[in-house]
Amino acid sequence: MSAGTTGQTTGEEWPRRGEPDGRGPRIDPGEAAQARRLVEAISHTFDSKVVGQEALRTALLVGLIGGGHVLLESVPGLAKTLAASTLASTVDASFSRVQCTPDLLPSDIIGTQVFNPGSGTFTTELGPVHANVVLLDEINRSSAKTQAAMLEAMQEKQATIGAKTYPMPNPFLVLATQNPIDEEGTYVLPQAQMDRFLLKTIVDYPSPADEVEMLRRLKSGALESRTVPPVVSRQDVLWLQDLSRRVYVDEALLRYIVQIVHATRHGGDYLPQEQARCLEYGASPRAAIAFVQAACAHALIHGRDHVLPDDVRAMRYMVLRHRLIPVSYTHLT
């Protein structure tokens, strides 16, 4: 599949200038440069606490700037909690962590009304989901009812407590983790909820060099404090989100994205039969929307006011891996 008719073109002929995109004012060079400086400040501070894990950093930045949520899959001990809290501190945002368990109730997440016998009135206590950055640890251990409450908060950016609706703070980023090894006592995330995550990334082990650097910093005391001073403000993040929505996407790239998503639904038109039959359901139109969001944020992170085919390709695995449903092994045998 090629981007329009240009094959593997990634050069500066993208985008074709002067074509309207209906997105409002274009980004000027000064705004792009300022965005690059803000992203570099966040990245530098993040890297001071989280050694290696460039792919994780990219996923978190794309999720934050693209206005989406991120699903993290990895074994324990790969700095997911540290990464989430560091990102929140870096952008002067509130942070909360929820350890998901089977007995976790929706009210434990979104909050509840508490009766005050002295005054005879109810007061509302907001739950931990009412933070700028929320880490849902082992989300697949929570019950379906609790997952549904999380879904409302993630998708609608609001939570209903009693008869009143409370908006989530802005910016609002949910990071959810899954352990691929220990699946006993877990609840499979419904596809509808998986689809609400902008990205899914698999956090890998650090390289030997990164692990040595981690130990070196640990011995020197550089990692003793888990907090970092903020280097940008929440208002800066909201500005970056607005800027991301103004990143230019050429018409040919929109067709390229739709071609990719279409290929997941009609694998027989693009893949050998033995491979095509392994995929039961392809990606929904929400995947195409996620591609645009992620590619725009990825372009802005790299200091550009327009999306290149490379941005789309860089996001392809993170956007698609949780949206494709393979055929059950029993159906293949």
Please identify what each model-predicted range represents.
Residues 36-69, 75:
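Pre-Walker A (pre-P-loop) alpha-helix and adjacent loop at the N terminus of AAA/AAA+ ATPase modules
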Residues 65-100:
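Walker A/P-loop
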Residues 68-69, 131-132, 169-175:
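Loop/turn-to-beta-strand initiation segments
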Residues 116-119, 156-231, 238-244, 296-298:
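Canonical AAA+ ATPase core
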Residues 116-134:
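Conserved alpha-helical scaffold flanking the Walker A/P-loop in AAA+ ATPase domains
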Residues 131-154, 186-191, 208-211:
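Conserved AAA+/SF3 P-loop NTPase catalytic/coupling segment centered on the Walker-B
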Residues 220-328:
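Basic, amphipathic alpha-helical bundle interface domains used for macromolecular binding and assembly
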Residues 330-333:
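Conserved small/polar residues in nucleotide/adenosyl-binding loops
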